[in-house]
Amino acid sequence: MAAFKPQWNDWCPGCGNFGILNAEQQAIVELGVDTKNVVVVSGIGCSGKIPHFFRTPISGVHTLHGRAIAFATGIKLSNPDLVVIVNGGDGDLLGIGAGHFVAAGRRNVDMVVILHDNGVYGLTKGQASPTLKRGEKPKSLPRPNINDAVNPIALAISSGYTFVARGYAYDVKHLKELIKSAIKHKGLALIDVLQPCPTYNDINTKEWYDKRIYKLDTLPDWDPVVKKPEEVNEKIKRAIDKSLEWGDRIPIGIFYQNELVPSYEERIKANSPAYLDYTPAKQLIEKEGKLTTIIDPLLKEREVD
């Protein structure tokens, strides 16, 4: 393994990515997770640089545009003992990567997906991303956006994610606690992080968010956790209803959590009882990369005349 060597951070001054990076690092340290077992996976975009900027010695994988979830799924299923955290922009995860985003929910792999949600493609000069509202015109666009926006919270819940939350990049302490909860959750977790882009999005600024954001856990009757199967539909309905609240008031916090759903690792073990004891990462391979397991006798038994 190459020596750990963090790179100099080149995000724009005031970028919400700084808060997300700090929250992730603090969450990992406070949970006491062995950093040798942490893998941060990213796609392409400003958020894609995040593995390079960690000051804690984690393993980082900077992957292809829209494919971070696919890479992360392979990493986690190969070695379920790892803590796998995906970082991707709204364009990366909900544009070119939308298929992987939805398919991941059906599997419920035990990993965390952190969505950097700023409404624009920051790396390529501020084009409208899938989360920019129709009719909005940040300074990077010559005309108002003509596409409707994706609702990340509602999409994640309807796709099958079992932990769904929203954070705010400039409230690092609150975001840190969300990330800690997501890591401890047994199943697929999404945190949609509202992240101002001071360079290209002059609508959803820090000042704009600060006047609107409130925390769900300040509501006296808010309880997003499913405790028995009969509660699922009502909890989902309430979470999606809250996700539609946008304008003068914007909620952050945990919208939905359900640990009654078996993780993908548990489902694999049900079909292959030795899976967790003898995962792909533990299987021996030759120097040339070939498996040492001989499966010819097994295939012979299954030949059809």
Curated annotation (Swiss-Prot):
Its EC number is 1.2.7.11. The keyword DNA-binding does not apply. It catalyses: a 2-oxocarboxylate + 2 oxidized [2Fe-2S]-[ferredoxin] + CoA = an acyl-CoA + 2 reduced [2Fe-2S]-[ferredoxin] + CO2 + H(+). CDD domains: TPP_OGFOR (cd03375). The record marks 125 as: Plays an important role in the binding of CoA. Changing residue 173 to A: Same oxidoreductase activity as the wild-type. It comes from the Archaea. Mg(2+) binds at residues 90, 118, 120. Keywords: 4Fe-4S, Iron, Iron-sulfur, Magnesium, Metal-binding, Oxidoreductase, Thiamine pyrophosphate. [4Fe-4S] cluster binds at residues 12, 15, 46, 197. Thiamine diphosphate binds at residues 44-47, 65, 91-92, 122-123. GO terms for molecular function: 2-oxobutyrate synthase activity; 2-oxoglutarate synthase activity; 4 iron, 4 sulfur cluster binding; magnesium ion binding; pyruvate synthase activity; thiamine pyrophosphate binding. InterPro entries: 2-oxoacid:Fd_oxidored_beta (IPR053399), 2-oxoacid:Fd_oxidoreductase (IPR051457), OFOB (IPR011896), PFO_beta_C (IPR032686), THDP-binding (IPR029061), TPP_enzyme_TPP-bd (IPR011766). Heterodimer composed of an alpha and a beta subunit. Catalyzes the coenzyme A-dependent oxidative decarboxylation of different 2-oxoacids such as 2-oxoglutarate, pyruvate and 2-oxobutyrate to form their CoA derivatives. This is 2-oxoacid:ferredoxin oxidoreductase 1, subunit beta. The lineage of its organism: Archaea, Thermoproteota, Thermoprotei, Sulfolobales, Sulfolobaceae.
